[in-house]
């Protein structure tokens, strides 16, 4: 597909099999991005957390090194696309240092995406897609998104509209 616009073709939000709801390996996605004339492709699987919480939609912490290596291989294999290392992360205040110091710092992630799959409400984490069915829950969701943005850890928020929950 020819891009006649002055706006570059980019994708900053993508998932591989590691998210448990997608398929494919990083290099396959980047090759497809190249074939579609994308200039920039951000690989952004759901973040692993050191305590492996919410394992049904994210990779385990022990998979993190393999994930980073898969992105590095794709960067070398498809040099015509700028491949960025990222993760889509729940904002869990107790893991701010992990996100800032380990992912953005030590492991040199290019950026992080904020995610609102889970919402803290009265001491528990509710699924944002199935449990936000009353005003107090929605208020908690909005407050949590605001805290996420105020943390300045994330470049943008993925699907803040909690799609699929109407």
Locations of regions flagged by a protein language model:
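An N-terminally biased module of ancient metal coordination in phosphate/nucleic-acid-related enzymes
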Residues: 1-93, 98, 164-166
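Extended substrate/RNA-proximal surfaces in nucleic-acid metabolism proteins
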Residues: 54, 61-166
């Amino acid at each position: 597909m020819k891009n006649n616009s002055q706006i570059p073709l980019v994708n900053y939000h993508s998932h591989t099999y590691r998210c448990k709801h997608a398929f494919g390996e990083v290099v396959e996605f980047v090759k497809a991005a190249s074939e579609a004339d994308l200039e920039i492709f951000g690989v952004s699987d759901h973040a692993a957390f050191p305590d492996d919480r919410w394992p049904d939609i994210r990779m385990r912490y022990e998979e993190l090194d393999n994930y980073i290596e898969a992105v590095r291989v794709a960067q070398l294999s498809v040099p015509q696309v700028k491949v960025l290392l990222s993760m889509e992360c729940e904002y869990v205040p107790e893991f701010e240092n992990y996100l800032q110091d380990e992912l953005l710092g030590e492991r040199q992630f290019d950026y992080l995406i904020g995610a609102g799959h889970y919402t803290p409400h009265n001491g528990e984490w509710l699924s944002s897609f199935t449990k936000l069915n009353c005003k107090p829950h929605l208020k908690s969701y909005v407050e949590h998104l605001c805290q996420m943005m105020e943390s300045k850890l994330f470049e943008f928020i993925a699907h803040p509209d909690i799609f699929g929950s109407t």
